[in-house]
Amino acid sequence: MALTDSKKGKNSIVDLLSLNIENYGFWIYSLILTIVVFYTFGVEYSDWLIRIESKSLFLYNHLFFQDVVLAPAGLLSYISLFFTQFLHSPLIGTTIFTLLLLFSAYITKVTYNISDRDSVIAFLPAILILIINGSIGYALYTIKTAGFFFMPILGYTLSTVAVWSINKIKSPVLSIPAIIIWCFLGYLGFGVYALAATVAITILQYKRECITVAKIAILVFALLFLVFTPLVTYNLTTSANSLLSTFLLGIPNLTEEQNNAIFSSASALLIALQIIPALYKPLPLIKAQHYLIFQSAVLAVYLLTSYLCWFRDTNFKAEIAMSNAIDREDWKEVCNIHKALTEKYSASDKKAYNKLHSKVNAANTSSEMDLIVEKMRNDFFEPSRIMVQYKNLALVKLGTEGNQAFTCKDGGREQKAQQTIPMVLQCGKQLYLYYGLPYFAYRWCIEEAVEYGWNVDNLKYATLSCILTDNFEMADKFLHRLEKTLYHRKWAKQMRSYIDNPEQIAQSTSFQAIKSLMCYNNTLSNDQALIETYLINHFTAKRPENATPQFDKVAMLWALQTQDIGTFWRCFSHYVQTNDTQKMPRHYQEAAYLYGNLEKNVNISNMPFDKTITASYDSFNRFSSQHRVRTIEESKYPFYERFGETFYYYYYFIRNLNTY
């Protein structure tokens, strides 16, 4: 009796849950989606949203409106750019994006008469949109479509609204002109989404109970304009590179090198989802417990697919966060991001080394050991070259590069991109500008604008470059654009004060710090898009005749990175001539003591090294004699644990770095 009651109790709970999901499923799924989106964008990827906004531009004037809207799918681009500007505030941007996702699910449910019982199906477009945006990754820096972040959600949602609206027309006499007008004008405004919506409208109209002649007429006119409209656009405009791309207008345009299977598949499926629901029929009734399992399984598939298809890379997130901090000139935050990651992965690095050590000890041959080491290399945290150079720049601005340059992990982890994006496209404007090369910064602003269009980011750095080189006329033109934005007009007003009153530049610590490095002939040369190599040569190859103390300080940092003894001593001799040497920075002492012992060309016996420097060097040598180094990668971790914050470790273990 008790067992029977227990089973009845369990069944009643399942029935109650199923009933609640059937009646309130749409709102339950909406709540889950809201939580997921706000956590993802508001917490984990807020810096990513800010960077997306900086790579776009929305101006409040009629010329900008005309330029954008008159292009095919221009209305979609314009509305997308309008919403993209709000990503500058991640909270506002996330709220808008979430509301649009929820509305897309609602309009899908209403348009295609999806029952409350099957409402989980209505959220599939929202999930695909999350996957499309989340799979962009490093293509953020090369994507040529303005407002790409909001284009899928707006294209799908607004086109589905059109399906709902035209489907309300009962008379075939009125629906045929409506389909024709929508197909033509909708395509010009929304591109491929309008074509897909036209197919959906045609299917829904064809399924109605009406005379056969009306059905045939609807079908013929719809097919005619589905083909005719893109062909006319292709022949009358120059916006499309090929006939195929004419049919795909409205889909964010990734370069061939950066396109990926996830992005392409999700985009294609999103377009198809405007057509497939038109064929929707309610799912057959099933038992309550089976229904609950089905809904839970679909929800789990949604969440798992979104997670697996999302581009997740620790270094990518850190690069963007550090880049945003540099834009704000928050140098401490740049260093803190790098330091926090070093500390965060210290425990996992230790576990990875223990695992590596046990596997290597169990290996029988050297080749087997090398294979194990190579396979497990990615188990250890290693910063990218951009992260390292951002951190070094921040230390220069804080004046602590000589004591802290090697206190955080160094390295050169490769990008998780289909094709490597050159560093100069990601950080060229920032590094060149703040290292006193505004002409190069300006050049890369123009290069980016020509290839990918003007955006907030390159407009700002072009403005700063022009102010530093007294090109106030060009700076005024760039500021004229920024003054017509919503979030950047305040910054533009501040910069305009320097144009109107050039004497204020001398009072700006930020500008003066850059100008102190501008002690060279202002001529452009070919950097071959290798920014690290160029900066090393710029600061260490030939010293300018009017070099400043600050120039010699920065030259020392780059000299240490060369790991070249002759380059170090040459820059060191310049440094001691122009800077206070009463308290020699720690890393300079470490390098001098190490190089002096490796090569006897320079007598270091009279140099006043700190006792801690000589003691750490002796300790490093003793540790080296006790721990045989078979390969650098295999022995890195134990040496890093003891000496990771010294130049000795950097010199011996940070090798074979590839710049890009």
Region spans (language model):
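Membrane-interface micro-motifs in multi-pass membrane enzymes
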Residues: 51-54, 69-73, 117-172, 187-194, ...
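Transmembrane helices and adjacent periplasmic/lumenal helix-loop junctions
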Residues: 167-214, 219-235
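Membrane-interfacial entry segments at the cytosolic side of transmembrane helices
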Residues: 22-25, 209-218, 283-297
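Internal/C-terminal transmembrane anchor helices
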Residues: 287-313, 343, 347
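Transmembrane alpha-helices of multi-pass, membrane-embedded glycan-processing enzymes
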Residues: 93-107, 154-158
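Start-transfer (signal-anchor) and selected internal transmembrane alpha helices
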Residues: 1-37, 289-296
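Membrane-interface coil-to-helix junctions
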Residues: 39-93
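Soluble catalytic regions of membrane-associated enzymes that act on cell-envelope
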Residues: 308-518, 543-564
